[in-house]
Amino acid sequence: MDDVVEVDAPAEVVWSVLTDFDRYGDWNPFISRCRADLTVGAPIDMRVEQLAPRPIRMREWIRSVTAGREFSYSMKPIPLGALRSKRSHTLTPLAGDRTRYESHFELDGWLAPLVGLLFGRGFKKGFPGMTTAVEREAERRHAR
């Protein structure tokens, strides 16, 4: 699942929105709480909305970080190739203090179709909703 937007704010501002985990609850409709220190191998703990009637707590693991440019994380794979995931956020600076923000999510393994049935509607609402919210929050902060 991929979403791409061009944000009317510099990459530094968009990066600050994405990595200001303590403030996710102020603007993010999909992840209402997040704790992470962006160290490869460290946990990222999230409270995810819109996947079930109640929020779901998730712990995933930081896979990559290029400061100011990208970070990604994934769940611990379930044995025998049953399920694995990857989520990434990538920023590309553009001319005129604009930024391309790319949001990517993938889910693989033989349990992926079942997870898709259970949470697919939430994924289709949540990931694009967060992308739009990142855009709005970055533009709001830049306009200050």
Question: Which ranges hold each PLM region?
Answer:
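Short strand-connecting beta-turns/loops that link adjacent beta-strands
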Residues: P10, T39, A67-G68, L94-R98
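Glycine-rich portal/gate segments that line the openings of hydrophobic small-molecule binding cavities
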Residues: R35-L80, G129-R144
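Beta-strand/loop substructures that line and gate deep hydrophobic ligand-binding cavities in soluble
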Residues: K76-G129
